[in-house]
Design a protein with these regions (language model features):
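Glycosyltransferase donor-sugar binding loop
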Residues: 40-44, 225-239, 255-256
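Short alpha-helical donor nucleotide-sugar binding micro-motif in glycosyltransferases
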Residues: 74, 264-269
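Membrane-proximal helix-turn-helix segments that form the acceptor-binding/catalytic region
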Residues: 79, 128-150
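Donor nucleotide-sugar binding/catalytic pocket of nucleotide-sugar-dependent glycosyltransferases
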Residues: 144-183
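A structural motif in glycosyltransferase catalytic domains
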Residues: 21-22, 29, 197, 212-215, ...
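Active-site donor-binding segments of glycosyltransferases and PAPS-dependent sulfotransferases
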Residues: 7, 22-28, 32-95
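Conserved donor-binding/catalytic core segment of Leloir-type glycosyltransferases
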Residues: 7-8, 189-207, 213-216
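Nucleotide-activated donor-binding/catalytic signature segment of Leloir-type glycosyltransferases, i.e.
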Residues: 55, 239-260
């Protein structure tokens, strides 16, 4: 009996949390001699050295447009699944690919279709999210019932998928941080005179940064400081949040942090 051929599709993951998810998945494939792993990625430059047992196929053009992305998911993947005779197909970025395999899985992490309070200001501030709000629910629905399992990170998202798409195979898979803490020369707040609250998230409407700002306003005199991982230039929503916090000395905009910096900020926070 031949090996299982497991394809991990993540052509849209290039930076940040999603790219970390990809690396965590690839880490879990180590020492699985009964399987051959093939990863479909935007670029394998960083990954090949970290995961030499994985075969990488690059699709650098897919991320450039939704037309190319949909063609990839519904046409390219189907052809590839037949050529390589894949047994398992893992879609890491929301859309269930059109493939010919015995076992198919999808990881869904975009909550846009379930957003309940989208105001006119939200639409103007982040029009891309409004498009996600309108169309992502339709994209989720295509082929979703053909999956062996649908993975999400949170219990509330599981309930929404079960309700909206009548699914019984939704699995909550919470992130597991297996990365050790490392010293990178950052100055530590060892005196603990101030409380540090670290909120690492991209500036998107559904991340509710307004709640952080309101809390910071109330707690200005309590030595409680909030640290955010953007700088206000990323999009209109980021600019709005930055402006709301412009007079608050207990809100700190750190900008983008790499994985090591993130881990160390976690360690140094309360």
């Amino acid at each position: 009996m031949g090996k299982n051929i497991v394809v991990i599709s993540a052509v849209n993951f290039t930076t940040g949390g999603p790219f970390t998810v990809l690396k965590n998945v690839l880490t879990a494939t180590k020492d699985r001699a009964e399987c051959k792993f093939i990863a479909l990625v935007h670029s394998s430059a960083e990954l090949m050295e970290l995961f030499p047992w994985v075969e990488f196929i690059e699709y650098p053009e897919v991320k450039s447009s939704w037309v190319k992305r949909l063609y990839f998911e519904y046409i390219t993947c189907n052809r590839l699944s037949k050529v390589i005779k894949a047994t398992h197909w893992v879609c890491l970025h929301d859309i269930t690919a059109n493939v010919s395999v015995p076992y198919r899985f999808v990881y869904c992490h975009n909550p846009a279709p379930f957003y309940k309070y989208l105001s006119y200001r939200d639409i103007i501030g982040e029009p891309k999210f409004y498009l996600f709000y309108l169309f992502y629910g339709l994209l989720y629905n295509i082929n979703i019932k053909k999956n062996t399992a649908v993975f999400v990170q949170q219990q509330w998202l599981k309930k929404e998928f079960e309700k909206k798409y009548k699914l019984k195979n939704v699995v909550v898979s919470r992130p597991e941080d297996i990365c050790p803490f490392e010293s990178d020369g950052l100055v530590r707040n060892n005196n603990k005179k101030d409380v540090r609250i670290f909120y690492p998230a991209v500036p998107r409407i559904f991340k509710n940064f307004e709640v952080i700002i309101r809390a910071a306003q109330i707690l200005q005199d309590k030595n409680i400081h909030f640290y955010l991982t953007f700088d206000g230039t990323e999009n209109k929503y980021a600019k709005r949040i930055y402006k709301l916090a412009s007079e608050l000395k207990n809100v700190h905009f750190l900008g983008y942090l790499n994985a090591t910096e993130m881990v160390n900020f976690y360690q140094d926070s309360d």
